[in-house]
C-alpha cells in the first residue's frame, strides 16, 4: 500500500526487504530512505549498515521513519539520535488496535499543509523513548486512559494512562532532514487519506 500511494503521487520508489541495500550501492543517487519495518533483534542493522545510513542522512539526504521502524534497538541506542525517539521493547505499550482521532496540533508546521484532524484505525503508541531536544511535534492524539486485558493467558490487566501523545515530528540529523510518524501499523491504516497526506508531506519536506 505504501509503495502504491507514493508512486501514484509521482515518486520513484525502489522497495527492498533486506538491509544490504544500505551498503550495496542502492542508495547512490537516491533522495531519501524510508523505513517501514522493525530493526531490532535478528533484524538489527550491522555496524557497516548503521554507518552507511548515518552518512547518507547526515550528508544531506532525507529519512522517513514509519511506526515500528522507530523502535530503538538495545544494541544501537544512537538510532534515537537520528529519529528523536520511538518504541522501546518491553517498555512501550498501546491500547488495543482501534479507531481514534488524530489531531494536527500545529497547523503552521512545514509538514501540516492540507492536513486536518482525521480518524484512523491504528495503534496509539505510549511510553516511547522521546527526545524533546530537536523534535518539532505537529501531530498528536488524546486518550482518556483505560484498563485492558493482555492477549495471552495468565497475563494481568494493564492500565494505560490518559494524556496527549505525539504521533509525528520532524528533526534534523547533520545536514539531513528526518520525518517520523508513529502511525501506520498495517495496510488498513496506510489506506487512511490522512495518513497518506501526512507521509507525502513528510517526503516532500525531507527531499525539498
Name what the model sees in each region.
Residues 1-30:
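Aromatic-Pro/Gly-enriched surface loop or interdomain linker
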Residues 2, 26, 49-52, 75, ...:
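Stable alpha-helical elements in mature extracytoplasmic
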Residues 7, 91-174:
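Catalytic beta-strand/loop cores that center a nucleophilic Ser/Cys/Thr
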Residues 15-17, 67, 182:
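Residue-level recognition of beta-strand->loop/alpha-helix junctions
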Residues 16-23, 48-51, 162-168:
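Alpha-helical scaffolding within the catalytic cores
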Residues 20-22, 38-43, 63, 69-74, ...:
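Solvent-exposed loop/turn segments at secondary-structure junctions
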Residues 27-74, 175:
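Short alpha-beta junction capping motif
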Residues 201-208:
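C-terminal alpha-helix
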Amino acid at each position: 500500500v505504501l509503495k502504491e500511494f507514493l508512486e501514484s503521487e509521482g515518486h520513484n520508489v525502489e522497495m527492498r526487504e533486506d538491509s544490504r541495500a544500505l551498503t550495496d550501492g542502492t542508495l547512490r543517487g537516491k533522495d531519501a530512505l524510508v523505513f517501514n519495518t522493525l530493526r531490532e533483534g535478528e533484524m538489527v542493522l550491522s555496524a557497516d549498515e548503521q554507518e552507511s545510513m548515518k552518512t547518507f542522512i547526515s550528508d544531506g539526504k532525507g529519512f522517513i521513519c514509519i511506526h515500528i521502524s522507530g523502535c530503538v534497538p538495545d544494541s544501537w541506542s544512537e538510532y534515537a539520535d537520528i529519529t528523536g525517539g520511538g518504541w522501546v521493547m518491553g517498555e512501550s505499550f498501546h491500547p488495543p488496535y482501534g479507531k481514534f482521532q488524530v489531531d494536527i496540533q500545529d497547523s503552521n508546521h512545514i509538514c501540516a499543509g492540507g492536513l486536518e484532524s482525521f480518524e484512523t484505525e491504528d495503534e496509539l503508541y505510549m511510553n516511547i523513548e522521546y527526545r524533546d531536544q530537536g523534535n518539532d511535534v505537529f501531530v498528536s492524539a488524546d486518550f482518556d486512559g483505560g484498563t485492558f486485558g493482555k492477549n495471552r493467558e495468565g497475563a494481568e490487566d494493564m492500565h494505560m494512562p490518559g494524556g496527549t501523545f505525539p504521533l509525528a515530528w520532524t528533526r534534523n540529523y547533520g545536514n539531513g532532514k528526518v520525518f517520523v510518524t508513529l502511525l501506520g501499523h498495517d495496510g488498513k491504516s496506510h489506506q487512511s487519506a490522512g495518513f497518506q497526506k501526512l507521509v507525502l508531506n513528510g517526503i516532500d519536506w525531507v527531499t525539498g
